[in-house]
């Protein structure tokens, strides 16, 4: 009863034209046809491809993951290019980027960005570096001692870093990110309990 009111919003984002073209290509592929006939043996792999595609096409190994996808590439598109982030190729990332820019320009808020995929966190990290947005990152590769130091720095209200990148697997019990008053769950986990654990990192005792 001592916590502020929590507002949850589900934001629906349109696929970019490139995402939509790749999505339809995959649905028409022989692999999906086999799955629909009950002959396919890798339904989880297919779902994983669609989940990554909905985050950003750069998370896929193109054209290997989607045969024939090279015919759909926008002019100048280079799969695997790690020097920049093509924000416009992802509906979700386009919305998120505008949201982060608004927070940076108009508020003193801090935000936690959560994803199941370290590849997506890599994408966020490149975006932050290119936009010169201060951030911290915590994933499963970081040891316990460094984690707490990172959390303490982020929770310091005078710290200039306003973004905290967090893998959902690392966002379990005991992690207290009350320095943030906003959180974006970029993609859901298979287990809803994992999502709830991650969401609880912000809305907890000490939150203003």
Features from the language model and the residues they span:
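Conserved Helicase C-terminal RecA-like lobe
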Residues: 2-19, 27, 37-163, 167-171
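Short, conserved loop/helix-junction motifs that constitute active-site signature segments
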Residues: 3, 177-178, 207
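Flexible, active-site-proximal loop/turn residues at the rims of small-molecule/cofactor binding pockets
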Residues: 170, 189-190
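A short beta-strand element within the Helicase C-terminal
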Residues: 175-188
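Conserved SF2 helicase motif VI
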Residues: 191-208
